[in-house]
């Protein structure tokens, strides 16, 4: 990991996958932090995306930063990492993400990696490409407390161009807690 990694790095990674794989007519599904690079990438690849699914994800607006929405745990971890000169901070645990099964929590924790500090401090540059996608869906994981996701769900419910779903029996990692439910929803909306 490098101190040079920022939000633009992740946006570029996503854009390049679309370009190099010549992807078109894609249903772009983003989860959690993925709402940031997903929103940024749509500014460049929106014409290749036929539908989007924001899965318990941030829905940033122009000029916002991830740090502005961070939980107390994430803010403390970020500031501690910066103070120590570390390029990244630990990921929250699966327990903090309210993963339901103890076995699944152990598996998720074995797969998480630190997140680069730079992704939280760079403001995002958006012109509205996300809102131009014809088919938009927001899925909220009901058992994970996150005010920014509650706000995103409320905004999407109020905007008739978005479909909304709530994973009532799932923590933040819906793909772990309710995989078949998620597959059914994705097939319905993509």
Predicted regions and their residues:
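Flexible "cap/lid" loop of the alpha/beta hydrolase fold
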Residues: 43-90, 94, 119-120, 148-149, ...
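Gly/Ala-rich beta-loop-alpha elbow adjacent to hydrolase catalytic centers
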Residues: 29-34, 38
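Active-site loop/oxyanion-hole signature of alpha/beta-hydrolase fold enzymes
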Residues: 1-27, 43-44, 67-73
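Active-site nucleophile elbow and catalytic-triad environment of alpha/beta-hydrolase enzymes
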Residues: 110-129, 134
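Short, hydrophobic alpha-helix immediately C-terminal to the catalytic nucleophile
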Residues: 39-43, 183
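Short, proline-enriched alpha-helix->beta-strand connector loops that line the catalytic pocket
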Residues: 131-136, 159-161
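Conserved loop-alpha-helix segment in the C-terminal half of the alpha/beta-hydrolase fold
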Residues: 142-176, 184, 189
């Amino acid at each position: 990991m490098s101190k040079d990694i920022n939000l633009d790095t992740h946006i570029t990674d996503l854009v390049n996958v679309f370009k190099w794989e010549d992807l078109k007519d894609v249903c772009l599904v983003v989860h959690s932090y993925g709402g940031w690079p997903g929103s940024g990438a749509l500014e460049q690849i929106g014409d290749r995306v036929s539908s989007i699914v924001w899965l318990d994800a941030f829905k940033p607006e122009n000029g916002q930063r991830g740090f502005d929405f961070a939980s107390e745990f994430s803010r403390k971890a970020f500031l501690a990492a910066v103070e120590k000169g570390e390029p990244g901070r630990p990921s929250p645990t699966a327990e903090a993400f309210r993963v339901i099964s103890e076995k699944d929590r152990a598996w998720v924790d074995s797969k998480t990696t630190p997140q680069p500090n730079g992704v939280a401090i760079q403001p995002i540059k958006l012109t509205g490409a996300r809102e131009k996608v014809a088919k938009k869906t927001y899925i909220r994981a009901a058992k994970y407390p996150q005010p920014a996701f509650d706000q995103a769900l409320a905004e999407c419910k109020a905007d008739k161009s978005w479909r909304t779903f709530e994973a009532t029996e799932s923590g933040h990692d819906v793909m772990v807690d309710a995989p078949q439910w998620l597959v059914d929803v994705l097939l319905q909306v993509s």
